[in-house]
């Protein structure tokens, strides 16, 4: 029985390895959730970053809680998301574990710089949202960013998926 379980486990691990692919190198950052390594296009799995043309709003001056008047301004949250990812990677090699491909033939992957999960880091710092439609992996990280008013959670924004539908 033990031998049977060991064989089953080995076969299971082998099949899992067939579904994943490791991609590593110094990436070109396309936007907050897409990178290219060599000729491979990689979508950071489970997250959705603001689009490059997307604007978000944040309060930059609050008169007082009594008067209740805030000055808000639009900012390019998609560009900031991309820039923060560029700064985090800092021309270093990253390692991506791909689980499959999307409808655009991009690899869907979790990417790491050293031991830092970049997908998680983007969501936890308010630079992307958890892509709930495809994964529940980063919901706690999104809640953390929202609770602490980090990144896009400092103000108001449309979730990138909704913004794409409207634009």
PLM features: what roles do these ranges have?
Residues 2-8, 12-167:
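Small beta-barrel nucleic-acid-binding modules, primarily SNase/OB-fold domains
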């Amino acid at each position: 029985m033990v031998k049977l379980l060991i064989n089953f486990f080995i076969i299971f691990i082998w099949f899992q390895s067939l579904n994943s692919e490791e991609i590593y190198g110094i990436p070109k950052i396309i936007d907050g959730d897409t990178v290219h390594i060599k000729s491979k296009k990689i979508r950071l799995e489970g997250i959705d970053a603001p689009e490059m043309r997307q604007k978000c709003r944040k309060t930059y001056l609050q008169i007082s809680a009594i008067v209740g008047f805030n000055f808000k301004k639009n900012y390019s949250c998609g560009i900031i998301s991309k820039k923060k990812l560029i700064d985090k990677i800092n021309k270093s090699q990253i390692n991506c574990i791909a689980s499959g491909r999307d409808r655009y033939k991009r690899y869907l992957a979790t990417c790491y710089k050293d031991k830092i999960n970049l997908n998680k880091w983007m969501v936890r710092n308010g630079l992307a949202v958890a892509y709930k439609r495809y994964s529940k992996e980063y919901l706690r990280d999104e809640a953390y960013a929202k609770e602490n008013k980090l990144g896009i959670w400092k103000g108001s924004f449309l979730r990138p998926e909704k913004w794409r539908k409207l634009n």
